[in-house]
């Protein structure tokens, strides 16, 4: 064994990074290289790479090492091995090139004390490392911006939930990047029954017309600390983000995004202003009475908003009301039905004390913040019958 082919690191730190890296891996066949992590030791850094061949993940942490080397190892096995040593503050990981194994042991404070706890995990061959390797940094990116992490995380929270979760739905499984008439970066997502439209303050000069898989945004929002900046880049084929100690890229979705502008009503005759806290409370209560259809019936009138949930099979029925001063309405008396799950999820991303609800008779429900035109959410109505 080459005794200098090792590194020492904080146990909890590497365990957390491995857990994040293996989170995108879909392949569970331990003998397949696409179930593995690529571990690269470069000077005093450990680079952890993983991919599902659509999303590419890379994180970097500081370590103690003497020699640069690469190891490809099954992600789940490596995580379990490191987790088994979580009662050690630090661990030492040695690469045995002769038998292609990683040896993991607790790092002791007393150098005279011998190691007792240790594990050995098999690794893949050098040939398999070459088959696994990928480079996401040197892509020919043609478009790049920087945005505050806090702002981008907020945009993700408001956009990602509206996209279709079924990857077979192609463009509906993505987030559409465009720009508005003022050249501000605009993001849109829809599953065909609801839609989120979010405008940023980022000015872009280039033409923007990309569809990014929503999976990467659901992954990003759990990684971002909310501090510092995010670098965002696009090429003809890839979307790339870089922040903190992470670099993440994914392949773009090919296809034409639906004409979302044609769905947005130009003018709504009926407008209401509702206390967000009271609305959340009433929705939580009426949700107990909504059946599997998820149908919520809203009755708008001058004096009150009625929320009706009913199970036609069991006969259970719940009616809850919101009145002045928590409800103001300008419009004709109207009754409409919407999916309560969509409604609850949508209002959870609003941060103001009141929410505007606008609609035309029998048409799409538009949710927005008073005097804020940067975020709009649309919900298609359900049949009342």
From Swiss-Prot:
Subcellular location per the Swiss-Prot or TrEMBL entry: Cytoplasm
InterPro entries attached to this UniProt entry: DNA_clamp_sf (IPR046938), DNA_polIII_beta (IPR001001), DNA_polIII_beta_C (IPR022635), DNA_polIII_beta_cen (IPR022637), DNA_polIII_beta_N (IPR022634)
A GO molecular function held by the record: DNA-directed DNA polymerase activity
Alphabetical GO biological process terms: DNA strand elongation involved in DNA replication
Key words of the record: Cytoplasm, DNA replication, DNA-binding, DNA-directed DNA polymerase, Nucleotidyltransferase, Transferase
Keyword Thylakoid tagged: no
Main location: cytoplasm
GO cellular component, one term: DNA polymerase III complex
Keyword Cytoplasm: yes
Domain of life (superkingdom): Bacteria
CDD domains: beta_clamp (cd00140)
Record's subunit section: Forms a ring-shaped head-to-tail homodimer around DNA which binds and tethers DNA polymerases and other proteins to the DNA. The DNA replisome complex has a single clamp-loading complex (3 tau and 1 each of delta, delta', psi and chi subunits) which binds 3 Pol III cores (1 core on the leading strand and 2 on the lagging strand) each with a beta sliding clamp dimer. Additional proteins in the replisome are other copies of gamma, psi and chi, Ssb, DNA helicase and RNA primase.
Function per UniProt: Confers DNA tethering and processivity to DNA polymerases and other proteins. Acts as a clamp, forming a ring around DNA (a reaction catalyzed by the clamp-loading complex) which diffuses in an ATP-independent manner freely and bidirectionally along dsDNA. Initially characterized for its ability to contact the catalytic subunit of DNA polymerase III (Pol III), a complex, multichain enzyme responsible for most of the replicative synthesis in bacteria; Pol III exhibits 3'-5' exonuclease proofreading activity.
Family: Belongs to the beta sliding clamp family.
Annotated protein name in UniProt: Beta sliding clamp
Species name: Borreliella burgdorferi (strain ATCC 35210 / DSM 4680 / CIP 102532 / B31) (Borrelia burgdorferi)
Gene that specifies this protein: dnaN
């Amino acid at each position: 064994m080459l005794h200098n082919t090792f590194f020492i690191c904080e146990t909890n730190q590497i365990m957390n990074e491995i857990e994040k890296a293996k989170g995108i891996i879909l392949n569970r066949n331990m003998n397949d290289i696409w179930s593995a992590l690529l571990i690269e030791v470069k000077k005093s850094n450990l680079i952890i790479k993983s991919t599902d061949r659509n999303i590419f993940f890379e994180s970097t942490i500081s370590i103690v090492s003497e020699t640069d080397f690469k190891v490809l190892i099954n992600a789940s096995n490596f995580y379990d091995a490191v987790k088994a040593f979580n009662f050690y503050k630090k661990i030492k990981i040695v690469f045995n090139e002769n038998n292609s194994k990683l040896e993991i042991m607790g790092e002791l404070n007393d150098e005279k004390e011998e190691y007792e706890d240790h594990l050995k995990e098999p690794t893949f061959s050098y040939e398999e490392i070459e088959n696994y390797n990928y480079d996401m940094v040197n892509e020919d990116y043609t478009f790049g911006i920087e945005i505050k992490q806090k702002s981008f995380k907020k945009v993700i929270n408001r956009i990602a939930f509206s996209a279709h979760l079924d990857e077979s739905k192609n463009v509906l499984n993505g987030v559409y990047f465009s720009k508005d008439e003022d050249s501000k970066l605009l993001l849109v997502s829809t599953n065909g029954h609801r839609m989120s439209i979010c405008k940023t303050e980022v000015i872009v000069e280039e033409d923007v017309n990309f569809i990014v898989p929503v999976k990467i945004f659901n992954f990003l929002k759990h990684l971002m600390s909310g501090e510092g900046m995010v670098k965002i880049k696009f090429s003809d084929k890839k979307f790339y983000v870089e922040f903190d100690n992470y670099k993440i890229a994914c392949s773009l979705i090919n296809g034409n995004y639906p004409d979302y502008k044609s769905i947005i009503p130009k003018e709504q005759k009926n407008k209401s202003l509702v206390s967000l806290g009271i609305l959340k409370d009433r929705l939580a209560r009426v949700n107990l009475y909504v059946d599997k259809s998820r149908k919520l019936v809203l009755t708008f009138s001058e004096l009150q908003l009625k929320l009706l949930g009913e199970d036609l099979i069991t006969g259970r029925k719940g009616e809850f009301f919101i009145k002045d001063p928590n409800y103001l309405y300008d419009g004709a008396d109207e009754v409409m039905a919407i999916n309560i799950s969509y409604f609850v999820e949508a209002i959870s991303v609003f941060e103001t004390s009141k929410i505007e609800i606008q609609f035309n008779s029998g048409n799409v429900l538009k949710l927005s913040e008073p005097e804020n035109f940067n975020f709009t959410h649309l919900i298609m109505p359900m049949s009342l019958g």
